[in-house]
């Protein structure tokens, strides 16, 4: 009996459950049918100064806070309304919003637009169109030149009228706040408040009741269908954004069927009117977004180059053009220090440096409490200007290892190597005192503005025919003089000629993902203010020296060796210093350095350590020069290539004509260059210390393991290497 009773009770309960489910489904179907026939959009009147923040159910318009768990854009008061709305078609348009990590916003799209007329004020427009839209702009501005303007408080009014036509099925995207998503139906109000350059635009989805809002209001009449409009965050940040103003009578082609007018006056009230047919869904907010200035961050906008400069360009021009009197002076040889004496003499007569040091601009601001190369050099120059000669550079040479780790007192070293170490040391000092940081700041110190220039490198893979080009920072030029080369012009012509990279010198092609035969060409992109040319007289294979005469001019025109010879900038350089290596056996293990210096009066002097002799220009031009220093007639403007991440930086060494030298390969960067970060703190040398074999060196600087890879200047440290640098194609 008990078993029968339990079985009957179970069947009775099952029947009751089925009966309740049938009743619920009947009621739900009845409600759905009733709502489909009876629900009509209502007109909402605006009044007062506030708006209700109550969210409305998308079906019955009852106040609620529950929203769709997937799309986050609609709200429901109960599961019945959610099921009903899902069956009506929400399942076709419901999708998860896309999250943009950079902007920290959700982007949602699934709305259609048709026939909307919107008038609202604006001072500028930025266009982001997706499809089938036509924008016509008529601007009345103070200038017709396209430019980028920054919206500022109380800016001058810009009069323009914009016509926007939008057809059906316009698919657009809009940002939705992660924290705020407000929906209203049947009524839209758009208000824009312009106070001190701020723009406030809020478009909301309104329900079937009265709402209030502060500021200027606009009425919209809606019939035959719901109007879906999402909540938009305030646009007060527009005063920090840049907007693009199109020139007069500009137009962009997009198709459409409704008009959007933007009056020029900021005080005009927005007027919104809309007529929609059955099945229409639109979002006025998305229309407005076509006319919103693009949001920009400080990281994405390039900051002013003047703000990033380490050294004032105006001060640099004054120092470069300043005629400071300094008579030639001698330096005492402290034991195999002729190489250092010759280099210090050349630096002492380099115009920007000499003016900077004589005026005492460094010592007044130097923060170093210990030994400082620039301070000691300044002290030496001030003594020379006082008429003392010869002078002892003991305070500089006693700290040679602080200038170059491999340098030491009493050792015979290479003059070019010491020049690079000295310039590197000065650069590190100026960087520590620089008010700015970054690659462009490194290139705009006093040293960077003085010696820095740019090369244009082009490489073509012979396998896939892929071409790449990149600008490279240069600090000096090392050119080969072997073979039939008899003049500086011929050496520069060979330097800028095509070279085949084959064998051990093959180029790593990023497209082929392997080492391939390639053709390479280097040209001068921007000439430096002080051009240092090193004639490679020392041979790495037999430790010999090329003692043949090389003709070099007093005035050097580098336009034939520039990547754009038709460019308006045709710099002419004047010779002002020459370093000569004298030897008896034509070897790099012995010899003596002397230098020739030209004063501001145009007089030439030969300086041999402590001895100073006046000479004629003809005598200088007949010498077997090792290093040539040329000064540009007028300083060049700040480089347009400075600080770019897509740019390679290197201290320059030359590309030789010989094909048997080993190159350092770098497969990750499609390059043969080394990677050394200048900002790492271990500034061994800004230049390559090994691409030219020392003429007076010991085993510390002349060993075969230290000889250069001549193709890209060996394994010298570079200013700032970008590991993720990408090649740029060119025609």
Curated annotation (Swiss-Prot):
InterPro entries: Papain-like_cys_pep_sf, Peptidase_C19, Peptidase_C19_UCH, USP_CS, USP_dom, Znf_MYND
Stretches for region Disordered: 171-219, 262-281, 637-702
Pfam families: UCH, zf-MYND
Keyword Magnesium: no
Bias kind Low complexity: ranges: 677-701
Keywords for this protein: Hydrolase, Metal-binding, Protease, Thiol protease, Ubl conjugation pathway, Zinc, Zinc-finger
An example molecular function term from Gene Ontology annotations: zinc ion binding
One record GO biological process: proteolysis
Biased composition (Polar residues): 207-219, 265-281
Positions of Zn(2+) 1 binding: 57, 60, 77, 81
ZnF locations on chain (MYND-type): 57-94
Binding annotation for Zn(2+) 2: 68, 71, 90, 94
Active site per UniProt: 338, 592
EC class: hydrolase
Domain spans labelled USP: 329-633
E.C. code: 3.4.19.12
UniProt keyword annotation of Cell division present: no
Catalysed conversion reaction: Thiol-dependent hydrolysis of ester, thioester, amide, peptide and isopeptide bonds formed by the C-terminal Gly of ubiquitin (a 76-residue protein attached to proteins as an intracellular targeting signal)
SUPFAM superfamilies: Cysteine proteinases (SSF54001), HIT/MYND zinc finger-like (SSF144232)
PROSITE patterns documented for this protein: USP_1, USP_3, ZF_MYND_1, ZF_MYND_2
Superkingdom, natural source: Eukaryota
Annotated function: Recognizes and hydrolyzes the peptide bond at the C-terminal Gly of ubiquitin. Involved in the processing of poly-ubiquitin precursors as well as that of ubiquitinated proteins.
Family per similarity comment: Belongs to the peptidase C19 family.
Name assigned to this protein: Ubiquitin carboxyl-terminal hydrolase 17
């Amino acid at each position: 009996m008990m078993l029968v009773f339990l079985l009957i009770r179970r069947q009775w309960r099952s029947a009751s459950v089925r009966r309740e489910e049938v009743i619920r489904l009947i009621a739900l179907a009845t409600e759905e049918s009733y709502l489909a026939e009876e629900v009509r959009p209502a007109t909402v009147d605006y009044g007062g100064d506030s708006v209700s923040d109550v969210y409305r159910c998308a079906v019955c318009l009852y106040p609620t806070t529950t929203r769709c768990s997937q799309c986050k854009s609609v709200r429901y008061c109960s599961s019945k309304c959610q099921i009903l709305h899902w069956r009506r078609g929400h399942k076709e348009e419901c999708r998860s919003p896309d999250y943009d990590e950079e902007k920290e916003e959700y982007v949602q799209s699934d709305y259609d637009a048709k026939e909307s007329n919107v008038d609202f004020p604006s001072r500028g427009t930025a266009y982001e169109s997706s499809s089938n839209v036509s924008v016509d702009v008529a601007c009345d501005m103070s200038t017709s030149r396209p430019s980028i303007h920054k919206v500022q408080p109380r800016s001058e009014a810009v009069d323009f009228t914009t016509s926007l036509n939008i057809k059906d099925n316009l698919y657009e995207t809009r940002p939705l706040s992660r924290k705020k998503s407000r929906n209203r139906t049947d009524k839209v109000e758009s208000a824009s408040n312009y106070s001190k350059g701020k723009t406030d635009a809020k478009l909301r989805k309104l329900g079937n009741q009265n709402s209030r809002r502060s500021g200027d209001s606009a009425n919209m009449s809606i019939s035959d269908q719901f109007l879906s409009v999402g909540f938009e965050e305030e646009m007060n940040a527009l005063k920090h954004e840049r907007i693009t103003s199109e020139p007069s009578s500009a137009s962009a082609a997009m198709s459409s069927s409704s008009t959007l007018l933007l009056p020029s006056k900021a005080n005009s009230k927005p007027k919104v009117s809309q007529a929609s047919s059955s099945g229409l869904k639109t979002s006025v907010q998305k229309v407005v977004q076509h006319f919103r200035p693009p949001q920009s961050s400080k990281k994405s906008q390039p900051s002013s180059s003047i703000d990033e400069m380490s050294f004032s360009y105006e001060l640099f021009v004054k120092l470069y053009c300043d005629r400071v009197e300094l008579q030639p002076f001698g330096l005492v040889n402290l034991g195999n220090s002729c190489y250092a004496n010759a280099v210090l003499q050349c630096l002492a007569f380099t115009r920007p440096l000499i003016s900077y040091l004589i005026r005492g601009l460094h010592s007044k601001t130097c923060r170093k409490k210990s030994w400082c190369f620039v301070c000691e050099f300044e002290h030496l120059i001030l003594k020379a200007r006082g008429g003392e000669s010869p002078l002892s550079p003991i305070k500089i040479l006693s700290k040679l290892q602080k200038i170059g780790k491999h340098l030491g007192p009493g050792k015979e070293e290479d003059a070019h190597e010491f020049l690079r170490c000295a310039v590197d040391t000065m650069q590190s000092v100026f960087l520590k005192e620089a008010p700015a940081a970054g690659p462009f700041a490194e290139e705009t110190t006093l040293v960077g503005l003085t010696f820095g220039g740019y090369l244009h490198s082009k490489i073509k893979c012979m396998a896939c025919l892929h071409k790449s080009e990149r600008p490279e920072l240069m600090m000096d030029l090392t050119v080969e003089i072997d073979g039939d080369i008899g003049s500086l012009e011929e050496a520069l012509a060979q330097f800028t000629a095509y070279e085949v990279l084959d064998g051990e010198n093959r180029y790593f092609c990023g497209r082929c993902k392997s080492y391939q035969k390639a053709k390479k060409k280097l040209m001068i992109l921007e000439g430096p203010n002080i051009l240092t040319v090193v004639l490679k007289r020392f041979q790495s294979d037999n430790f010999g020296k090329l003692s043949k005469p090389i003709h070099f001019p007093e005035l050097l025109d580098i336009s034939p060796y520039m990547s754009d010879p038709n460019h308006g900038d045709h710099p002419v350089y004047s010779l002002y210093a020459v370093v000569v290596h004298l030897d008896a056996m034509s070897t790099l293990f012995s010899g003596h350095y002397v230098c020739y210096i030209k004063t501001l009066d145009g007089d030439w002097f030969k300086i041999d350590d402590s001895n100073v002799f006046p000479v004629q220009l003809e005598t200088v031009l007949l010498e077997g020069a090792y290093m040539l220093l040329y000064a540009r007639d007028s300083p060049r403007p700040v480089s347009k290539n400075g600080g770019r991440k897509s740019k390679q930086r290197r201290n320059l060494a030359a590309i030789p004509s010989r094909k048997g030298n080993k190159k350092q390969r770098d497969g990750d960067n499609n390059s043969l260059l080394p990677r050394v970060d200048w900002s790492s703190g271990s500034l061994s040398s800004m230049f390559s210390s090994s691409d030219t074999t020392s003429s007076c060196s010991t085993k510390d600087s002349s060993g075969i393991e230290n000889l250069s890879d001549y193709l890209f200047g060996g394994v010298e440290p570079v200013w700032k290497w970008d590991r993720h640098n990408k090649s740029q194609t060119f025609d």
